[in-house]
């Protein structure tokens, strides 16, 4: 309407303005008026488009653009990840995205910014600017040309400037520090871990043991490793591995599980940052057991991830200065050559991060074939094999990964961070398979390569402990404490060794101060166990305070029940009746045949052939206590059974005891004047039966938790030895009993087959 009104007023004005002029000028014909009305321009010029037509075309073009955009997104016609990744290389001012300021810099209208890129609070993380910017060289040329054309046009639209002739944007400014965040996540290189996305074992909740976790080394700071590589936006020439939760398979034949009461040997709680699982190697005709995977409590996990951090530890980590110390520089995993093939490495790593393990293995194998001197390609291959071993539960594949980690370390020009991570992971996986001596050699090499890294020396000390070499372990921790006297990890392990050497009072301050330090790897059930035990032996009443603290921190089921190799959910009580166990037939058989069992035991004693061996677990305060074992870890001792053939034949009828791989069947003789310290057994998976054979009338008693009982000849006592128990023999003659361990009645058949032996 406005346009039409203007046209009319224009005509009237023309008529009145000319007055009595010529008729051709003074009045317009209808045709002329129509021409003016529809063909004229609002400024009086003819021949242009009307406003209405212009608006219509504008709307058509806008709608066409909208629907085109919808079609592009809907049909996935453009790989936005790829395009955005291309735009990222033109981030000239380092603010993490491509905008008008970047365009001005590239067109020479603005000085290049030297400020640090701003990081949103949710993404804030300490990082270093890359030392060397390397253009991405492995992208297809046609994609790069297309991206450049898009960038050129976009630049000029945003700044309304003349096209810069002959300017090569890629040469003007190489790749900067922040590619797309999704790519960053996939660029992270464990796990195992651990991590490595956790692969849950295929067992029901009640079949999963309650794990007590230990962070075994102070190189824990580096051992968030092996799974995520560092974000390229912060350091494009490096990658940061992060521990994955790894659950693999244990070569049980290679590991001797020590009874927890034996204090002279550091138990093989293998593998920092991992949770141990086992695949039993069954006979080929029994495929069912081949898939048995049980989460074993002899596992080592970062305490911070698995347990509620105690107040003392919170006090330590809540300190801002302490947090600043924890922050570490992210490792650099790419050498100069690997930077030139970074795009190919990233593509292969992206497959691994997306869980396409088989494809990732093939991709890294191809990279190793093409670039045999590339440490990062070979490291990626090792990680993929590591992941594949986890996926397939294959020790054979894991052995291949261990070998590939070694190959990484043998290449020339390996970045120091990558070398350290490769060898640490190799050592970790060797321990996992029970190859303790091989792991020790790897740790020794690490210490030689990085002599100033005390965390590696702490790892080395653990390596010695795992093979029972307490003397060398002690030397290592003495060296660490001479350099860093407040190293809590070294303190608890040094105290552990002193206690194993029966230096009880001397061990207490090291164990206590080490736990109180809150350092990683110190919140370990074994250290609470041995600290409390040491205090009990010197008469320190604070022992139960530490047991209580260990219970609150999740290491013990209760103050009384302090076993560390446990299955969740099992009924827990100190004393049991035969009916409660369900093993009434076994109890009746033992009590009916107690004289037969007694006579064979006495005959073995009379032969004086040394079949009764002294107790060697350092459980006695004083006295003489010996044992004669018929079954151990579910295995019959044929030589021993020759001395008690009828007893062994009798027991063969009861698999709940002969098949108990977490217990023993044995004679136990204790002479007058013997006192056994308060102690607990290693596991809640068994119950212990005591059959009285030769019992003095008075002076012999046993306490379990807070109830004390005495033996009777021909009668069975049943208790759960995962509860604290203590024995006195103050009679005038020896005491002989027959000990029979049985599976806890609530364990399923599958658990009984699958649980590792103790």
From Swiss-Prot:
2-oxoglutarate binds at residues 625, 668, 688-690, 735. It is an enzyme of class 1 (oxidoreductase). It catalyses: L-aspartyl-[protein] + 2-oxoglutarate + O2 = 3-hydroxy-L-aspartyl-[protein] + succinate + CO2. GO terms for molecular function: calcium ion binding; electron transfer activity; peptidyl-aspartic acid 3-dioxygenase activity; structural constituent of muscle; structural molecule activity; transmembrane transporter binding. It comes from the Eukaryota. Disulfide bonds join 641-648. Belongs to the aspartyl/asparaginyl beta-hydroxylase family. This is Aspartyl/asparaginyl beta-hydroxylase. It comes from Homo sapiens (Human). The gene is ASPH.
């Amino acid at each position: 309407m406005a346009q039409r009104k203007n046209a009319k007023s224009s005509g009237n004005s023309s008529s009145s303005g000319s007055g009595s002029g010529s008729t051709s000028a003074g009045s317009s014909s209808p045709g002329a008026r129509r021409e003016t009305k529809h063909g004229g321009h609002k400024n009086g010029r003819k021949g242009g488009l009307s406003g209405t037509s212009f608006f219509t075309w504008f709307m058509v073009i806008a709608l066409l653009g909208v629907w085109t955009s919808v079609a592009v997104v809907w049909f996935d016609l453009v790989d936005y990840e790829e395009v955005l990744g291309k735009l990222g290389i033109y981030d000239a001012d380092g603010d993490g995205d491509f905008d008008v300021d970047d365009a001005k810099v590239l067109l020479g209208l603005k000085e290049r910014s030297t400020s640090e890129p701003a990081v949103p609070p949710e993404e804030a993380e300490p990082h270093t600017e890359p030392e060397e910017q390397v253009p991405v060289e492995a992208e297809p040329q046609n994609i790069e040309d297309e991206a450049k054309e898009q960038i050129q046009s976009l630049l000029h639209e945003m700044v309304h400037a003349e096209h810069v002739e002959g300017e090569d944007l890629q040469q003007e400014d190489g790749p900067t520090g922040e590619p797309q965040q999704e790519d960053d996540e996939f660029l992270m290189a464990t796990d195992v871990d651990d991590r490595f996305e956790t692969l849950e074992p295929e067992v029901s909740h009640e079949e999963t043991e309650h794990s007590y976790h230990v962070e075994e080394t102070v190189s824990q700071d580096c051992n968030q490793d092996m799974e995520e590589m560092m974000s390229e936006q912060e350091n494009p020439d490096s990658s940061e591995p992060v521990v994955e939760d790894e659950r693999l398979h244990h070569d049980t034949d290679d590991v001797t599980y020590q009874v927890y009461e034996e204090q002279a040997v550091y138990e093989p709680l293998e593998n920092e940052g991992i949770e141990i699982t086992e695949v039993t190697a069954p006979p080929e005709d029994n495929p069912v057991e081949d898939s048995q995977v049980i989460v074993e409590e002899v596992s080592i996990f970062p305490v911070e991830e698995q347990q509620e951090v105690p107040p003392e530890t919170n006090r330590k980590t809540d300190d801002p200065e302490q947090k600043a110390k924890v922050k570490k520089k992210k490792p650099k995993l790419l050498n100069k050559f690997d930077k030139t093939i970074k795009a190919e490495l990233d593509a292969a790593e992206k497959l691994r991060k997306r869980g396409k393990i088989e494809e990732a293995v093939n991709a890294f194998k191809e990279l190793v074939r093409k670039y045999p001197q590339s440490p990062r390609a070979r490291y990626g291959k090792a990680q993929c094999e590591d992941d594949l071993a986890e996926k397939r539960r294959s020790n054979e594949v894991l052995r291949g990964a261990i070998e590939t980690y070694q190959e990484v370390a043998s290449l020339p020009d390996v970045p120091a961070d990558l070398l350290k991570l490769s060898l640490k992971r190799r050592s970790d996986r060797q321990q996992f398979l029970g190859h303790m001596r091989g792991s020790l050699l790897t740790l020794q090499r690490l210490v030689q390569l990085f002599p100033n890294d005390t965390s590696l020396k702490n790892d080395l000390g653990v390596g010695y402990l795992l093979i029972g070499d307490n003397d060398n372990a002690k030397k290592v921790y003495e060296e660490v404490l001479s350099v860093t006297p407040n190293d809590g990890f070294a303190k608890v392990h040094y105290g552990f060794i002193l206690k194993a050497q029966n230096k009880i009072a001397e061990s207490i301050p090291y164990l206590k101060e080490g736990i109180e330090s809150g350092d990683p790897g110190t919140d370990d059930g074994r250290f609470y166990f041995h600290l409390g035990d040491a205090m009990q032996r010197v008469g320190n009443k604070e022992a139960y305070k530490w047991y209580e603290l260990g219970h609150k921190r999740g290491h013990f089921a209760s103050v009384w029940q302090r076993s560390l190799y446990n299955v969740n959910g099992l009924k827990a009580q100190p004393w049991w009746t035969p009916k409660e166990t369900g093993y009434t037939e076994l109890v009746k058989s033992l009590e009916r045949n107690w004289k037969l069992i007694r006579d064979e035991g006495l005959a073995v004693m009379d032969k004086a052939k040394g079949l009764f061996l002294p107790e060697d677990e350092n459980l006695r305060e004083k006295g003489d206590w010996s044992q004669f074992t018929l079954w151990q870890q579910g295995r019959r001792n044929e030589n021993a059974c020759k001395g008690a053939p009828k007893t062994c034949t009798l027991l063969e009828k009861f698999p709940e005891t002969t098949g108990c791989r977490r217990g023993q069947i044995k004679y136990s003789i204790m002479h007058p004047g013997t006192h056994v310290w308060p102690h607990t057994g290693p596991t809640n998976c068994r119950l212990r039966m005591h059959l009285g054979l030769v019992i003095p009338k008075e002076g012999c008693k046993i306490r379990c938790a807070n109830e004390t009982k005495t033996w009777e000849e021909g009668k069975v006592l049943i208790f759960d030895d995962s509860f604290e128990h203590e024995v006195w023999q103050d009679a005038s003659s020896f005491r002989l009993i027959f000990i029979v361990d049985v599976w806890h009645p609530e364990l399923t058949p599958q658990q009984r087959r699958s649980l590792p032996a103790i």
